[in-house]
Amino acid sequence: MNIGNVCIGKDEKIAVQSMLNIPAHDIQGNIDQAMKLKAAGCDIIRVAVPNLESVELIYKIKSFVDIPLVADIHFDYKIAIECANAGVDKIRINPGNIGDDSRVEAVANICNEKNIPIRIGVNSGSLEKEILAKYLHPTPEALCESALYHAALLEKFDFDNIVISIKSSNVNMMVKSYELVADRCN
């Protein structure tokens, strides 16, 4: 899979990704930090895009720093669409907080059109209520089920350029979750 000009997965070398931690409204600060990360050997940079006004940050960073850029989107699917139009190289969403299926479909469609991968981010601290009701608390099986549910939702809209990310403060739980996902995916 390609994230801009960086290949990830299978036999590719490990790509280093970092996330900018400057407020989105500080465009120059973000550009400076992105340049420092690239100089330090970072391969991919993720940036939070908290609102539509912040999409300008994507254009600015892309014009100053030649590095694949991942837009981290929460809650508003329109931000993901605008970031895709701004030339972002990957979009990180949690389909469970983007809205109903029509909104997930809109993001999948624009990403398909522009060949932009979508990273599904699943976190043990923010599992869906239905999954927590089933498992009672975060478990590797719960994290796996959430990730695969969201992947299946994207696949329902003919989107298969998917990266799965699972996070937990419990390292053993996280590793077991990845093992379960790997067993169920090709």
Regions found by a protein language model. Give the residues of each.
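Alpha/beta enzyme core
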Residues: 1-47, 51-71, 75-186
